[in-house]
Structures are given as structure tokens and as C-alpha cells.
Amino acid sequence: MSEENYMRIIDLRGRKLTRAEMLDAMPRAEMGTNEATELVQPILDDVKARGAAALRDFAEKFDHIRPENLRVPVEVMKAAVDELDPEVRAAIEESVRRSRAVSASQVPAPFHTDLAEGARVSERWIPVQRVGLYVPGGKAVYPSSVIMNVVPAQAAGVESLAIATPPSRNNADGLPDKTILATCSILGVDEVYAVGGAQAVAMFAYGAKGSEPQDGEILCDPVDKITGPGNIFVATAKRMVSGIVGIDAVAGPTEIAIIADGGANPSWLAADLIGQAEHDELAGSVLITDSEDIAAKVQEDLKYRVPRTEHAERVETSLRGRQSGIILTDGIEQSIDAANAYAAEHLEIQTADPDAVIAKIRNAGAIFRGPYSPVPLGDYMSGSNHVLPTSGTARFASGLGVHTFMKPVEVIEYDEQGLKTLAARVNAFAVSEDLPAHGESVLSRFIDDPYNKETIKEQEEQAGLR
């Protein structure tokens, strides 16, 4: 490990930046999306054409194991619950309880607006019928992501839930991690596939025919929407099938930003930056502060902590990467401007007056208020959702929630008098757009000959439309 500082300094002090310059100053990872697209397209095509046979081939190629059962038997998931460590099970069940409480409060209520006598517009929220939930594997296993995907979908009333998660080389039969399977069973999800990567996205988007007797004729039916985080290949595949199915977001590497003033605890700040860097070499860890003293103390604390953490090499790579850094500002207002430009997936506020800062934050996936609301709390057990927008997309997107799994549908309900009041104006609007048949559709309900343009106004007057 080097004695050099782990994080580069981005000094904004004394600089009056335009919006474009501020966005450009933010630390970001470089993503090879073009290369990923070239690799993903053949995977999508092959799964669409060959179904389960292609899924097994890709498992062997990428996961180095060929699962006998692509769909996990229900009895295996039930057995995984019985084998679960009691403390882990208690933690999972507490996380589920808190997530369900928050999700229940998010269910939108229908409403209606009466615009006039006989003129009503109402809105219904309808759950998506079938959803495919992706739970990543790789450097870690994420039973927490099962909870974050499944609980809001269930609260929304989704009828059919399917989960895909990579097969595990730690299991001789190629089944996924047992903690993930146990979590699925605890949540009552019995359609789980040992399929990872872009091929899982293809399976959800197109469905997959069986190739072995245990698959049945159809291994997996296509879904209406795909949610859940994943690596660049999963994210690219989701982007490429978007429009065929709905998606929640195209996720990039995970990230944290912390706004801290001179009163923050530098050891806690360092620990929180390391906690995010632990995810991935491309994870972004960003400290935004107007205190040069805090910045220096965090750098020193990192020198102590990084070599002692379990995944020190991964953490060091992340902290030294171009996607991480310490942003020095002139004051709290510039810190807020930088945070809004960065639009972090996770934004911690560790300042003397966190509420004043939060009031000015426009762009963040989730905000963690104060020193006792660290990001790992949200990762596992705060009740909030940890599937959040990354790579600056929090400027226009939000995290996963009940709304992700529902569609607002407007119901237009006018009676004869309600339509009659507007008929002439609808016709005038339609004619102005050179779409006269639109107006004729409405007028046909009240006059005999809407096609006679010479007498149209006279007919409207006789019908009481004017």
C-alpha cells in the first residue's frame, strides 16, 4: 500500500463555474458502453432464438458451471431457509418488516377531478402484471437486493414475480447462493432462475423455451418490466431491450457523496467512503467539504483504515480512480451546488444544520441525514430502497419504489351535456391542427352533417353547441 494520499483533490475554491463547467468538474467513471453493446447483442439474439439451451451455454462460458436446473426447485429454496444462520434470518426478517411498512405507505390512492357538470377525469393506479427482478452476484451476494425489489412489487400488487440471479460456483449443482434462495422463500417468491448477466435480461424480455425435460416446453414466460441493478453488461442489456419491455433504470457503478463541514467526524467520513468503495473498483466515493482541515484528516484516516479492511485492494483502486475525489469548496452553498451537479446515488449530509442543506438539494437518489444515518443503514435495514439512480441520473430519475411497479391510467368520463358544452371548441381545435375528422367524430353526436362545411356553424347553433 502506498503512503500517498488515496484520493485526488478537486479544488473549486475561488472559481465561478457555469453549469456546464460544474458538471464537467465532477468525478465520473469511464464506461465502455460501445464495447458492451457489441458483446451484449449476440447474447440477446442467441437467447431469443435458442432459449434455455443458450442460457446453459452462457452459464458455462461466463459462470464456469452448467446448471442442471435453470429454474430453482421450490424445495431447494425451502431447505435454504432451514439452513439459514439464525442471526442472518433475523436480520432479513427485520429488513423485510421495515421495507413493507415504508412500501405500504407509498401505494398511491386513486383520485378524480370534476371539471364541470358531467365532466370528470379520474386516475387509477394499476400494477404491472408480470415483472422480472434481477439480483446481481459477482464480487458479493445481495439478498438485500431481493428484498428491495420484491417488497415494493408485492405492495404494488404485481401478480407474477420472477427472479434471476447468477449460478454459484460454490454450489456443485450450479444453484444460486443459498442466502438469496432463502430470502426469496421468506418473501414467498417461488419462480427463481439460476441465470445471470445479459442472458437473464434476454430471458425476461423474450421468454425462453425449454431445452431439457426438466425445463418444460416453456422455461420462462416474458415479463412486462425488468428491474434491479447489475454490472455494465446487465445495464446495457436492459437499455437495449427497453421499449420491448419496461425497465427501472440503466444503472452504473454505485457511488456516495458526502457534504461535510468542519464539525464532521473525519474517521466516520473515511469509513463511509471506504464502505462504498468496497463494492467495486469502479465505485465512486466523493467528499465535498469547505474545510481543508477535514479533507486532510480524512486522507490521513484512510491511510490507517484502507490497509486494514477486508477488500483493501479493491477499495484502493476505487478511491484512486477518476470517479472518486475530495471536492474543496468556498462554503456550504458551493458544496450544495457541487452535490446537485454530481447528483449522487447516495448523499450523506454531515453538517451543523443538515435540514438547511437538505432543503436546497435537488438531485440525489437518497439523502442520509446526519452522522447516524450512514449509507449501509439504507443498504440493509432503514426501510428505504437501495436500488437508486447512478451516474448523475438522479438529476431526472428516482429510486425504486411502489410507483415503479404501477401505471397511472386516466379515465375520462363525460356525459352528453359535458361533451355538448365543448363540442364546437373541440372541432375548432381539430380544424386548426388540420385533423378535421377529430372534430367530425365529436360533432356527429349532435348534428346531422358534420361534413358540410358551409352549414357547420348553423348546424352547431341549431344543436345548441354555440
Q: Where are the language model's segments positioned?
A:
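Conserved NAD(P)+-binding/catalytic subdomain of aldehyde/semialdehyde dehydrogenases
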Residues: 189-284
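Conserved small-residue-rich beta-alpha loop and adjacent elements
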Residues: 113-182
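C-terminal core of ALDH-fold dehydrogenases
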Residues: 341-465
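A glycine- and small/hydrophobic-rich beta-loop-beta segment
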Residues: 279, 287-364
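N-terminal Rossmann-like NAD(P)+-binding subdomain of aldehyde/semialdehyde dehydrogenases
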Residues: 2-129
